[in-house]
């Protein structure tokens, strides 16, 4: 049983490489923020996308 748990842990560790995290959000120029954060124009709210639980993808506007 311990070997099964060890294998599962290592498998999940390789799946969660930081370079691949939240790719869809980052392609749009966004970052994952807490879901409660309010998006004020000219910022863009892309919704959940591929952000983790209770977070959403936001792109901060230029403010010009």
From Swiss-Prot:
Expressed by the venom gland. GO terms for molecular function: potassium channel regulator activity; toxin activity. Pfam families: Myotoxins. It is found in: Secreted. Keywords: Antimicrobial, Disulfide bond, Ion channel impairing toxin, Myotoxin, Neurotoxin, Potassium channel impairing toxin, Secreted, Signal, Toxin, Voltage-gated potassium channel impairing toxin. GO terms for cellular component: extracellular region. Disulfide bonds join 32-51. The keyword Disulfide bond applies. GO terms for biological process: envenomation resulting in occlusion of the pore of voltage-gated potassium channel in another organism. Residues 1-21 form the signal peptide. Its main location: secreted. Cationic peptide that possesses multiple functions. It acts as a cell-penetrating peptide (CPP), and as a potent voltage-gated potassium channel (Kv) inhibitor. It exhibits antimicrobial activities, hind limb paralysis, and severe muscle necrosis by a non-enzymatic mechanism. Belongs to the crotamine-myotoxin family. Monomer. This is Myotoxin-2. It comes from Crotalus durissus terrificus (South American rattlesnake).
């Amino acid at each position: 049983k311990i070997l099964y748990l060890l294998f599962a842990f290592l498998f999940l560790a390789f799946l969660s490489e930081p370079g691949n995290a939240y790719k869809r959000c980052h392609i749009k120029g966004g970052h994952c923020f807490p879901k409660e954060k309010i998006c004020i124009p000219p910022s863009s709210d892309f919704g959940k996308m591929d952000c983790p639980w209770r977070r959403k993808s936001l792109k901060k506007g230029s403010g010009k």
